[in-house]
């Protein structure tokens, strides 16, 4: 199996996740080629069994570079894709001290739904989606993030 992994990491968290994913999949005999979206053309994707897209979340959306990359994507119809994002961890409300509920988080964190909409609009088929939380604006990644990446890798059929 061949996986092409496209990320838009700005502060290095996405690169860490991509490298960990590639390492986990290599142990299963899967080849993973990791690319930053600035280094490849959305119009000339290399052939692959699975395309994986990863973007950090900014203000609840994928960063602009990734949105533009996905809008200009020229992918084969019916190609399989997965999404693995890095998003800010929910912070307690300053007045009440309570963490937002999952419903409230889903209302404001729209990274995966926006990316899915763009990719399915390009004729691709979703295989899996997941997220790894970042504890600060520039990192670090949450404790136990490697286990999340491993579980995500397990969700992808080899």
Where are these regions (language model features)?
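Flexible, glycine-rich phosphate/dinucleotide-binding loops
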Residues: 12, 41, 90-92
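Iron-sulfur (Fe-S) cluster-binding modules
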Residues: 1, 36
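N-terminal beta1-alpha1 ligand-phosphate binding loop
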Residues: 2-28
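Cofactor-binding loop segments of dinucleotide-utilizing enzymes, especially the Rossmann-like FAD-
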Residues: 8-10, 37, 86
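FMN-binding flavodoxin-like domain, especially the glycine-rich phosphate-binding loop
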Residues: 16, 24-28, 33, 47-158
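Short active-site-proximal "capping" loops at secondary-structure junctions
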Residues: 39-41, 58
């Amino acid at each position: 199996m061949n996986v092409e992994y496209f990320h838009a990491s700005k502060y290095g968290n996405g690169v860490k996740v991509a490298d960990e994913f590639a390492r986990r999949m290599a142990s299963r005999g899967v080849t993973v080629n990791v690319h930053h979206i600035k280094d490849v053309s959305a119009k000339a994707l290399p052939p692959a069994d699975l395309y994986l897209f990863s973007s950090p979340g900014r203000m609840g959306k994928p960063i602009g570079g990734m949105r533009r990359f996905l809008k200009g994507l020229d992918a084969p119809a019916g190609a399989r894709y997965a999404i693995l994002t890095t998003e800010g961890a929910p912070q307690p409300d300053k007045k009440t001290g309570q963490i937002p509920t999952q419903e409230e988080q889903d209302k404001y964190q729209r990274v995966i739904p926006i990316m899915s909409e763009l990719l399915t609009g390009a004729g691709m088929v979703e295989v899996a989606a997941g997220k790894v939380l970042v504890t600060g604006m520039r990192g670090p990644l949450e404790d136990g993030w490697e286990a999340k990446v491993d579980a995500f890798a397990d969700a992808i059929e080899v």
